[in-house]
Every structure is written in structure tokens, then in C-alpha cells.
Amino acid sequence: AARLIGDVPGLTLTLDYTHFTKIGLPDGEIEPLVQHASHFHVRGGRKGRLQERFSHNTIDYQRVAKVMQKTGYRGWLGIEYVWIDWEHCNECDNLSETVLYRDFLRGLTL
């Protein structure tokens, strides 16, 4: 992704850690992409699960927020829970999970 961004002037990413986490990529390997992002998706995820409950999430969003601050991230952030019969995305209460992440993000101290 970083190479493609370098080849296309003005191209930015919508960054969603859950897609990388699902395939087992650690947060530290995803972080270099933050500097190229203009939109960011937040939801719970873990290895093998594209979408997960807040209580089972393995993404360190406190760490991610610090990387965003360090790189001067100024883009949008959206809490993205979806309800579809695919990739276990119909096993969470989307509204409750969205509220949990909203409150978590509001409480972050950087």
C-alpha cells in the first residue's frame, strides 16, 4: 500500500486495522501506514475475526492514537460496525459496540 501511495500523487488511505489484524499482522507493522491515511475506521478485531466485541478486541487503540498524534493525523475517524452475514459480522450488537468505542475514544489520554 505504501508503495502505491508513493506512485500516485495525492492518494491517501482509509485505514482499518481490523483487516490487517484479522490476518495476524501486529499493530507495529500497520503503523507506517498511518502517515498516509486521511480516514480511519475503528472497531474491535482480532486474529481470525474482522469484527469483534470491544471486550475481545486485540487492537491497541491507545497505541494507535499515539501514533496518529505523533504523525500529525488530521483526517476523519469513524466507528464502523456492520451487520452482515459474512466474516462473523452478525455476532455483535452494533449500537452497543459503537457506544463502547465512542466512550473509549473520548476517554483517551495522549
Can you say where each PLM-predicted feature lies in the sequence?
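Histidine-acidic metal/acid-base catalytic patches
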Residues: 1-14, 21-110
